[in-house]
Structure formats: C-alpha cells, structure tokens
C-alpha cells in the first residue's frame, strides 16, 4: 500500500532545513519591534484555538462580581485596544475582557484579543496604569503572534529531533538515548527558554509603547515590576532556567525605554496619568 501524504509529518521533517531562513513562506515582521519571525500556523487557526480556550476558561472558572475590578479592567482594555487599532493592530480581533475570581497573580491574552485578569494581580497593579502595564504586555503577545511562533518552534524542534534520532539509529544505535538526551537538554536551555524570554522582553517593549499611546503614564511600567518582585518571597530559579526574565531585569529594561515612551504619552490624544486607584 503506497504511503499517504501527511501534511503535518512533511512539515515536521522539512522545517529544520529552514532554520534561520526568513525569505521563506510564512515569515513576517513583528509590529513595533520589527523582528523577523517564522510562522507556519495560519492566524485564523490561532484565533480559533484562542476563542475555544477562552470559552473553556470562562466555563471552568468563577467570574468576578467585583464591580470596580470589572469596570477598571474593561475600561483599560478598551483604551488599549483603541490605541492598537490606531496603529492598525488587532483590527481582526473581537476584544473581550474578563476578570476571574481567583487570587492567582496572573493575566493573559489569547489570540483574537481574549483577555483574562485574575483578581490576585489587581492589588499589585494598584491603579489603572498598573493594569495597563500588565494588559498591554499580554495583548502584545497576541498582536505579535507569539503563540503561533511557539507552535512553529515546536515543529522545528520535533523535526530536528527526528533527523538526529534517525542518524543515531543508523550510525550508533547503542547511543541513541544519549544523543536524544543531549539534544533535548540543549534545545531546552539553548533554544526554547531563551526564545521564551525573548518573547517576554518583546511584549514588555511593545506594551510600554501601547500603554503610552493609550494615555497611561509609562513611568508606572518599571514601578509595577518592582512591586511584583516585592510581592514574591522565596528563592527564585536562575534566569537561564526560567521562561521569563527576572523582574529586576524587566524593570531596568523598561526604564531604558522611558524617554521614547514618555514622548508618545505626551502626544497621546487623551492622558489619564495613573488613572483610578484600585482599593
């Protein structure tokens, strides 16, 4: 029986040949930071998965009934979405903002503009500008299509792993497990985690510009990460083992971006400063 063509298997094997090549199909440039990226997943599929995941989150979690939390998150979200639209970003997003009644210090934005804020992060935000810091970071992940880029990255790693495994099976079958262990460790610490930290830093950079253009004081960005660091106790893992840069590094990087961000804030159509304080 002839072997049937499998699109996913074909992509998985062929991607390693395209490592580092952004002249190929599926390459684009990120907004604001202008970084070249490779994307093999259509944006429509990303959005479809994002909507499905968001609906599941809302079904499985208790939605906050705190009127002030819902009002602040919704208001900040609409202002950030409008600032993004003025730059022709997220124009195909159906924005939605939900507060989850959970004390976890977390927030996220799924493809398609589906934003969730957990109640636990709001006291650290302290005010509307603090909410804007977190939310502009999260929506930047979606605007830059970091989710699609991570899916492409997984295909790259899987494809290269298959090639290495095939070579090991042919050349040194008794050492196959050793080769694969070294490969998996190398890709984790040399490729996957550094790339994840790059995404986080890029979302910070995009976010401070978006919040400034939305009329929120960008000086609050480094202050938020200093507060966030202070809210955590206990020993943290070394940065090279983490998916995120350290809070201190993020605050320092954002301070370097302040001069341009302040100019954008001063040129914003409306200025809200730090906005309403969150009790």
Mark where each language-model region is.
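A Zn2+-metalloprotease active-site environment signal
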Residues: 2-279
